[in-house]
């Protein structure tokens, strides 16, 4: 395994629904996902998460709650993705489509797992139960999980 790069993922999770975005271009295009991306130099992880949410959905947020951290390895890629996962139930603004993402609300019993990253169906249940977690997923290409670990933790 090589070096890692910091990424963020933000889920707007309200009592009956979750906001996801359809990725329109780049890494993960054609899949529903939370909002996030690379943390920029000189930026805290949380500030990066807030910036990505604003850029991709038009929403602003005061408080984020860190709920998980997952390391992703893609066979053949030298860099690991160190993804810090946040959620919030309170945002300002109305979701708007950006050049990268098309936001849409989903009822919690209608989350489109078949059109999401394959790992989401493993850790989303922990997120919905308001549990914190650490994970590692090793992928062969974008669709095949070769190996994974996922555990609930008390704190991150």
UniProtKB/Swiss-Prot annotation:
2-oxo-dATP binds at residues 8, 33, 35-38, 117-120. GO terms for molecular function: 2-hydroxy-ATP hydrolase activity; 2-hydroxy-dATP hydrolase activity; 8-oxo-7,8-dihydrodeoxyguanosine triphosphate pyrophosphatase activity; 8-oxo-7,8-dihydroguanosine triphosphate pyrophosphatase activity; dATP diphosphatase activity; metal ion binding; N6-methyl-(d)ATP hydrolase activity; O6-methyl-dGTP hydrolase activity. Its EC number is 3.6.1.56, 3.6.1.-. GO terms for cellular component: acrosomal vesicle; cytoplasm; nuclear membrane. Mg(2+) 1 binds at residues 36, 56, 100. Its cofactor is Mg(2+). Coiled coil: none annotated. It is found in: Cytoplasm; Nucleus; Nucleus membrane; Cytoplasmic vesicle, Secretory vesicle, Acrosome. Keywords: Cytoplasm, Cytoplasmic vesicle, Hydrolase, Magnesium, Membrane, Metal-binding, Nucleus, RNA-binding. Binds 2 Mg(2+) ion per subunit. Disulfide bonds: none annotated. Residues 3-132 form the Nudix hydrolase domain. Gene3D superfamilies: Nucleoside Triphosphate Pyrophosphohydrolase. InterPro entries: 8ODP (IPR003563), Nudix_hydrolase (IPR020476), NUDIX_hydrolase-like_dom_sf (IPR015797), NUDIX_hydrolase_CS (IPR020084), NUDIX_hydrolase_dom (IPR000086). A motif (Nudix box) lies at residues 37-58. 8-oxo-dGTP binds at residue 23. GO terms for biological process: DNA protection; purine nucleoside catabolic process. It comes from the Eukaryota. Mg(2+) 2 binds at residues 52, 55. It catalyses: 2-oxo-dATP + H2O = 2-oxo-dAMP + diphosphate + H(+); 2-oxo-ATP + H2O = 2-oxo-AMP + diphosphate + H(+); 8-oxo-dGTP + H2O = 8-oxo-dGMP + diphosphate + H(+); 8-oxo-dATP + H2O = 8-oxo-dAMP + diphosphate + H(+). Oxidized purine nucleoside triphosphate hydrolase which is a prominent sanitizer of the oxidized nucleotide pool. Catalyzes the hydrolysis of 2-oxo-dATP (2-hydroxy-dATP) into 2-oxo-dAMP. Also has a significant hydrolase activity toward 2-oxo-ATP, 8-oxo-dGTP and 8-oxo-dATP. Through the hydrolysis of oxidized purine nucleoside triphosphates, prevents their incorporation into DNA and the subsequent transversions A:T to C:G and G:C to T:A. Also catalyzes the hydrolysis of methylated purine nucleoside triphosphate preventing their integration into DNA. Monomer. Belongs to the Nudix hydrolase family. This is Oxidized purine nucleoside triphosphate hydrolase. It comes from Canis lupus familiaris. The gene is NUDT1.
